[in-house]
Structure formats: structure tokens, C-alpha cells
């Protein structure tokens, strides 16, 4: 299940902003970048959505796997997990999150990967 349109983070300007100004939290197989929302970088059609101002993106490079099937499976898994967390609490409001996976994530099973994601969210102060 993908995130609703109002919670998706899109556009190269948004990603550049996150890479330049975000606070980083790193673990063995992923990195979480968190920054305050900058609504000027969002297109006007997306701004009108009924979502809170929290937006998320998951970045998985070809280094993780050459097969798109595997990368998409990981993306869907993490989108679903973040979606549950976002609706569970309003602590994410007014923040942008970028979750980047490293090639070591393939060595872990799904439970360990989700636990690691939770640890990063706790370290960032969201849970």
C-alpha cells in the first residue's frame, strides 16, 4: 500500500533541500533524514491535500538490488510501516522524512528491517 498523495515527498528540489538541511540518523542498513517542512517547495496542486504537513519518501538505489521487483517490495513494506506510524501519532507533523536503504538491508529479514526503522524513528524523537 502506497502513501496517500498528501504524504508523498516529490521533486528534486525537495530532495535537494532534505540532503542539504536534514538531520541524519544512521543504522547498519538505512539512514533517516529529518527536516522541517518547507511548503514553498511543494506544487500548489499537492498543497491543497487534506493531509497534515508530514511528507515521506523512501530512496532505494540500484546498489541494493538490480531487480526492480525487490526494490519495490522493500519500498512497499516500508511505506506501509510508515503509514501505520503516521496515522498512529501526530508527532510527525510539520516534518519531512527521507529513508534511504543501503545494500546491507538485503541481509536482514523483514521483521529486523522494520525494527531498525522503528529504532531510527525513536532516535529521531518521533515515537
Swiss-Prot record:
The keyword Hydrolase applies. The keyword Cell membrane does not apply. It comes from the Bacteria. It catalyses: Endonucleolytic cleavage of RNA, removing 5'-extranucleotides from tRNA precursor. It is an enzyme of class 3 (hydrolase). InterPro entries: Ribosomal_Su5_D2-typ_SF (IPR020568), Ribsml_uS5_D2-typ_fold_subgr (IPR014721), RNase_P (IPR000100). GO terms for molecular function: 3'-tRNA processing endoribonuclease activity; ribonuclease P activity; tRNA binding. Gene3D superfamilies: 3.30.230.10. Its EC number is 3.1.26.5. One of its GO terms (cellular component) is ribonuclease P complex. One of its GO terms (biological process) is tRNA 5'-leader removal. SUPFAM superfamilies: Ribosomal protein S5 domain 2-like (SSF54211). Keywords: Endonuclease, Hydrolase, Nuclease, RNA-binding, tRNA processing. Belongs to the RnpA family. RNaseP catalyzes the removal of the 5'-leader sequence from pre-tRNA to produce the mature 5'-terminus. It can also cleave other RNA substrates such as 4.5S RNA. The protein component plays an auxiliary but essential role in vivo by binding to the 5'-leader sequence and broadening the substrate specificity of the ribozyme. Consists of a catalytic RNA component (M1 or rnpB) and a protein subunit. This is Ribonuclease P protein component. It comes from Prochlorococcus marinus (strain SARG / CCMP1375 / SS120). The gene is rnpA.
